[in-house]
């Protein structure tokens, strides 16, 4: 029987927290101003109409409206938010 404890491995046992990146609001969803649309590293998605860019490349809505994902040239993707018509806003508020 051993009379000393095993020391175990000191080189393992670390892991980083997940970054929780990705698309947060999908095409066709209605968003409010300030809602985060995409969390990303670098500009995988580019800002389109009514979309702002944070210092960490987070895309967020500048106006209330509907999210659309569009192509910008052959390879670039852009995210835009288009305002809803006034009649549609009234219908959403009453629902």
Swiss-Prot record:
A cellular component annotation (GO) from this entry: cytosolic large ribosomal subunit
UniProt superkingdom: Bacteria
Signal peptide (UniProt feature, chain positions): none
GO biological process: translation
Polar residues: compositionally biased ranges: 7-20
Molecular function per GO: structural constituent of ribosome
Keywords of this entry: Ribonucleoprotein, Ribosomal protein
Region (Disordered): 1-24
Family affiliation: Belongs to the bacterial ribosomal protein bL27 family.
Protein name from the UniProt record: Large ribosomal subunit protein bL27
């Amino acid at each position: 029987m051993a009379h000393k404890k095993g020391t175990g491995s000191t080189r393992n046992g670390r892991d980083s927290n997940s970054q929780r990146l990705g698309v947060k609001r999908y095409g066709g969803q209605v968003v409010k101003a300030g809602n985060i649309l995409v969390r990303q590293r670098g500009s995988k998605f580019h800002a389109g109409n009514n979309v702002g860019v944070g210092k960490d490349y987070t895309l967020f809505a500048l106006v209330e409206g509907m999210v659309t994902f569009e192509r910008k040239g052959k390879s670039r993707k852009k995210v835009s938010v288009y305002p809803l018509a006034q009649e549609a806003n009234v219908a959403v508020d009453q629902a």
